[in-house]
Curated annotation (Swiss-Prot):
Residues 604-665 form the SH3 domain. The JNK-interacting protein (JIP) group of scaffold proteins selectively mediates JNK signaling by aggregating specific components of the MAPK cascade to form a functional JNK signaling module. JIP2 inhibits IL1 beta-induced apoptosis in insulin-secreting cells. May function as a regulator of vesicle transport, through interactions with the JNK-signaling components and motor proteins. This is C-Jun-amino-terminal kinase-interacting protein 2. One of its GO terms (cellular component) is protein-containing complex. Residues 239-498 are annotated as: Necessary for interaction with FGF13. GO terms for biological process: behavioral fear response; dendrite morphogenesis; excitatory postsynaptic potential; JNK cascade; MAPK cascade; mating behavior; modulation of excitatory postsynaptic potential; negative regulation of apoptotic signaling pathway. Residues 268-305, 451-467 have a biased composition (Low complexity). Residues 1-28, 40-160, 172-349, 361-501 are annotated as: Disordered. Belongs to the JIP scaffold family. PROSITE patterns: PID, SH3. It comes from Homo sapiens (Human).
Length: 824
């Protein structure tokens, strides 16, 4: 049964997936703590851009909304999944029954009369009984192209059978032609009241009518599941007189009221038993199921699903949505790698999303075992419904969800200067306070973050979270915390709210954009984020309303970052934002890609060593080190111990000498800059974050990093707003400088040598985003650093390009002389 199951899964998902489509890689929030961004760009960016057609997705949602009846019953379907792969004993029984049927067919041909050529359409197929309230799904897949058939002459190449008694019919099974085409063993067919068995004629019904052709792979049918299409088409074809044969080769238009019986009709023709075990595993998140199913499907269908390079379809807005015309296909990035962050969470070709959408659009409440595919919990006051709100968001991203709901605007509106009129229509009462808006073109469930149970989302300052299924660990924690807080009728207390704040710590969920009262990107300094109390008076009234909504969680009316219960994150101001990991994480970050410097005792000092091992102090005078910590060695002891300063934590102490390696300093670059006077340009921008990438150049790589960094920070706007920084560009390289919050960390910087900068550029659709890729000084590793500004960042890109060009023109003469080519 293994080969049949694989063939079954392969053919099913060949019809479910568009041509040349690769399963999107998992882009989840917890991946920021791992070594790199390989899940985005495993194949150097070529796996980033495969997004299905937005027109197809719109037609999918529109087509399904026309059918208000319940699609299917998942309780019966989950109970009958075992019919797909049966045991070997039934295989042996079916083989014996097949031999008996062949003998019976031979007898029928010898003793058949002309009256047996046309079967009686009336009593052959029993009507559904009272115990079967739901229409059954089709039992098989049409795996071959059917030839022309004539029901009168019966020239379709199938054997005739004589009317048999009920004793003989009980021992008969499907014809060999149909049995070879079925994915698994089928039980014996039932008979009508007259005792005559319906002839086995795959591909046509009892009156010789050809069934509807199956949808082409990647077509815009109302649903991508053949089982759903069966129910949808059976409504339109119900007026025909004839009913489908029980052994028809899975026309998606079959009515399923056939002689297959209850077990035969409940078989779902899209999931094998092995995949069912993955999809119904209790306690696991839906993203785990989705990724496992996608991986198994990719392995099975990789030879057949990529016959030719995919053509470029019109795409939905992918990276930072910019304005009302972002559904066009004019994006020319010079690379095929245009990723969509939530494609894997919302692609209609994923099986888990088919199931979840069938759940959300059925008129009757349907629940899977353990509610494994149910949407995220929603407060009672939230007006967005699973089907209506999601469809409304997908069709008009700028439309408001309701008077008290979540309003969605695009990213260009957020970055643009304040317009005289509102950027998006706001039905209902006017909203006095500012709101945090997130673009949601991918039909994610929108839930307010701080909405208390029994109270609607505050219209003054609504914080929305796109609860994608792929954000498994983060959303699991948040859903559990939301259920715990909803269970307490007394409102949100600090006790049950602490785990939610723990799930929103800076190093777990990074890079969120913040919007002020003018719907612009709010430029928040690091001093405000560092915990200075006097900054709380500078907050606007809208931010005060946000603090009031989350007062119990964040503690009082202070700045949200001030009262974070995470003691390791209290020293956040001493870190170079997300570039440095906290003391509890052992994962390597991107701080080793440049030289870190900060003010120590009023003097700017650069790091001299980099920690290569984690050192846990055992005495009070020892210094704790984490991997890749920047260290300033002040003295070298005789016993191979160093006395130094950890620039990440701001602590001094001794540590073993072999726990840190010296970093190459820019001595030659300094000498070169002193000989020839160099220019320096400074820009005031906001630093969003750094993330490691597997390739040193490419617009696709750059846009993927920007997309991941900018969209993944949308949950931590209150805790970790973007920090302002000065970008100094010269022939030496690029230096990032930002202010700290402590007396000892008034200013810290990160320097990237020009020889290690390999690529830079602005976002093709939104020039407010800029990033550059740097190489590790010693290793073959690459990191992308992303910045944002209220204005266009093209002058920054031009300045870096100018410095890049001049540097290589100056050093190319001795670094790569042309005469070396002809030495031989």
């Amino acid at each position: 049964m293994a080969d049949r199951a694989e063939m079954f899964s392969l053919s099913t998902f060949h019809s479910l997936s568009p041509p040349g489509c690769r399963p999107p890689q998992d882009i989840s929030l917890e991946e920021f703590d791992d070594e790199d961004l390989s899940e985005i760009t495993d194949d150097c960016g070529l796996g980033l851009s495969y997004d299905s057609d937005h027109c197809e997705k719109d037609s999918l949602s529109l087509g399904r909304s026309e059918q208000p009846h319940p699609i299917c019953s998942f309780q019966d379907d989950f109970q009958e999944f075992e019919m797909i792969d049966d045991n070997e004993e039934e295989d042996d029984e079916d083989e014996e029954e097949e031999e008996e049927e062949e003998e019976g067919d031979g007898e029928g041909q010898e003793g058949g009369d002309p009256g047996s050529e046309a079967p009686a359409p009336g009593p052959l197929i029993p009507s559904p009984s009272v115990e079967e309230p739901h229409k059954h799904r089709p039992t098989t897949l049409r795996l071959t192209t059917l030839g022309a058939q004539d029901s009168l002459n019966n020239n379709g190449g199938f054997d005739l059978v004589r009317p048999a008694s009920w004793q003989e019919t009980a021992l008969c099974s499907p014809a060999p032609e149909a049995l070879r085409e079925l994915p698994g063993p089928l039980p014996a067919t039932d008979t009508g009241p007259g005792g005559a068995q319906s002839p086995v004629r795959p591909g046509c019904d009892c009156e010789g009518n050809r069934p509807a052709e199956p949808p082409a792979p990647g077509g815009t049918s109302p649903s991508s599941d053949p089982g759903i299409e069966a129910d949808l088409r059976s409504r339109s074809s119900g007026g025909r007189g004839g009913r489908r044969s029980s052994q028809e080769l899975s026309s998606p238009g079959s009515d399923s009221e056939d002689a297959g019986g209850a077990r035969l009709g409940r078989m779902i023709s899209s999931i094998s038993e092995t995949e069912l075990e993955l999809s119904s595993d209790g306690g696991s998140s839906s993203s785990g199921r989705s990724s496992h199913l996608t991986n198994s499907i990719e392995e099975a269908s990789s030879p057949a699903s990529e016959p030719e390079p995919p053509r470029e379809p019109p795409r939905r807005p992918a990276f930072l949505p910019v304005g009302p015309d972002d559904t066009n296909s004019e994006y020319e990035s010079g690379s095929e790698s245009e990723p969509d962050l939530s494609e894997d969470a919302d692609s209609p070709w994923l099986l888990s999303n088919l199931v979840s959408r069938m759940i959300s659009e059925g008129s009757s409440p349907i629940r899977c075992p353990g509610q494994c595919l149910s949407p995220a919990p929603r407060p009672p006051g939230e007006p967005v419904s699973p089907a209506g709100g999601a469809a409304q968001d997908s069709q008009d991203p700028e439309a408001a969800a309701g008077p008290g709901g979540v309003e969605l605007v695009d990213m260009e509106t957020l970055c643009a200067p304040p317009p005289p009129a509102p950027a998006a229509p706001r039905p209902g009462p006017a909203q006095p306070g500012p709101c945090l808006f997130l673009s949601n073109p991918t039909r994610d469930t929108i839930t307010p973050l701080w909405a208390a149970p029994g109270r609607a989302a505050r219209p003054g300052r609504a914080c929305s979270a796109a609860c994608s299924e792929e954000e498994d660990e983060e959303d699991d924690e948040e859903e559990e915390d939301a259920e715990d807080s909803a269970g307490s009728p007394g409102g949100r207390g600090t006790g049950p709210s602490a785990p939610r704040d723990a799930s929103l710590v800076y190093d777990a969920v990074k890079y969120t954009l913040v919007v002020d009262e003018h719907t612009q990107l709010e430029l928040v300094s690091l001093r405000r984020c560092a915990g200075l109390g006097h900054d709380s008076e500078e907050d606007s009234g809208g931010e005060a309303s946000e603090e009031e909504a989350g007062a119990a969680l964040l503690g009082g009316g202070q700045v949200s970052g001030d009262t974070s219960p995470d003691s390791p994150d209290l020293t956040f101001s001493k870190k170079f934002l997300n570039v440095f990991v906290n003391s509890t994480s052992r994962s390597s970050s991107t701080e080793s890609f440049g030289l870190f410097s900060c003010l120590v005792n009023g003097e700017e000092r650069e790091q001299t060593h980099r920690a290569v091992f984690r050192f846990i102090p055992r005495h009070p005078d020892e210094l704790e080190l984490d991997v890749d910590d920047p260290v300033l060695v002040e003295a070298e002891e005789d016993d191979f111990w160093f006395r130094g300063f950890n620039m990440r934590t701001g602590e001094r102490g001794v540590f073993p000498a072999f726990y840190a390696h010296a970093v190459p300093g820019p001595a030659k670059d300094l000498l070169g800059s002193k000989r020839s006077p160099c220019w320096v340009e400074r820009f005031d921008v906001q630093f969003l974050g750094s993330v490691e990438v597997p390739c040193h150049q490419g617009n696709g790589i750059l846009c993927a990093a920007m997309q991941k960094i900018a969209t993944a920070r949308k949950l931590t706007v209150h805790l970790r707003p973007p920090a302002s920084c000065d970008l100094e560009i010269s022939l030496r390289g690029v230096k990032l400088s930002l202010s700290g919050g402590g007396p000892e960390f008034q200013r810290c910087s990160h320097f990237f040598q020009m020889k290690n900068i390999s690529f830079c550029g602005c976002h093709p659709r939104n020039s407010c985003y800029f990033g550059f890729i740097t190489k590790h000084p010693l290793l073959s590793r690459f990191a992308c650093h992303v910045f944002v500004s209220q204005e266009s960042m093209r002058p920054v890109a031009q300045s870096v390009g100018r410095a890049f060009l001049e540097y290589y023109q100056e050093h190319l003469a001795y670094a790569c002389p042309t005469e070396d080519i002809y030495l031989e």
